[in-house]
Design a protein with these regions (language model features):
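"…centered on the first transmembrane helix and the immediately adjacent amphipathic helix/loop
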Residues: 2-82
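Interfacial helix-loop-helix junctions of multi-pass membrane proteins
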Residues: 116-138
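Membrane-interfacial, low-structure loops and terminal tails that flank and connect transmembrane helices
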Residues: 2-5, 158-174
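Hydrophobic alpha-helical transmembrane segments
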Residues: 14, 105-110, 136-137
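Small-polar-interrupted transmembrane alpha-helices in polytopic inner-membrane proteins
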Residues: 19-24, 104-124
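Membrane-helix interface segments
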Residues: 11, 99-106, 129-133
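Membrane-interfacial alpha-helical segments at the cytosolic side of multi-pass membrane proteins
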Residues: 82-96, 141-157
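Membrane-interface loop-to-helix entry segments
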Residues: 72-88, 133-141
């Protein structure tokens, strides 16, 4: 009975990946002006938080100056983060289905990078936006971090190398 329930629930493990792809697609659907304003707002929020936590005493002019200066890195870091999360959301279901090692890295990487490339193509159809190979590269770095995180997390959760664990178990039976 338990195996039947697990088999029925396994396909639902892809829902977070589909939701993440939808979110990325919706961000890419924003025109260039909306996207820039959103990035500036987020950068401003980061510097307001830094000022509050570290008690820097920055006035609004200084915060705006820093937000303008760091808007581009904040935007690219957001790209990396969303693709890192996408890679996690894609890798975990593949892991659940039994993919491990290089096969997991390769398939999850191909799926996520292909989505990044298609997302850049989608931006050609949005006002004031354009494709960028550099963005696909930045997205790919996020994908690499996400897949590495899943592989390390699952390896640690399973207690390291499964071959050594199986050998250890056999010794106790003799």
């Amino acid at each position: 009975m338990n195996r039947i329930v697990i088999a029925l629930l396994k396909p639902f493990s892809f829902i977070p990946a589909i939701l993440m792809m939808s979110m990325i697609f919706s961000f890419s659907s924003q025109n260039g002006t909306e996207s820039s304003q959103r990035s500036e707002k987020e950068a401003r929020g980061i510097f307001i938080t830094i000022d509050h936590i570290m008690d820097r005493g920055w006035d609004d002019e200084k915060i705006q100056e820093l937000a303008d200066e760091y808007q581009y890195p904040v935007r690219k870091l957001a790209h990396m983060t969303e693709y890192c999360l996408l890679a996690i959301c894609v890798s975990l279901p593949l892991y659940v289905y039994g993919l491990r090692g290089f096969a997991l890295t390769f398939l999850a990487g191909i799926l996520c990078v292909a989505f990044a490339a298609s997302d850049e193509f989608h931006q050609t159809m949005v006002a004031n936006r354009g494709p960028s190979v550099k963005d696909v590269g930045i997205d790919s770095i996020g994908v690499l971090f996400g897949i590495t995180f899943v592989r390390l997390f699952c390896w640690i959760a399973l207690g390291g190398n499964t071959k050594k664990r199986k050998r250890r178990r056999r010794r106790y039976y003799y």
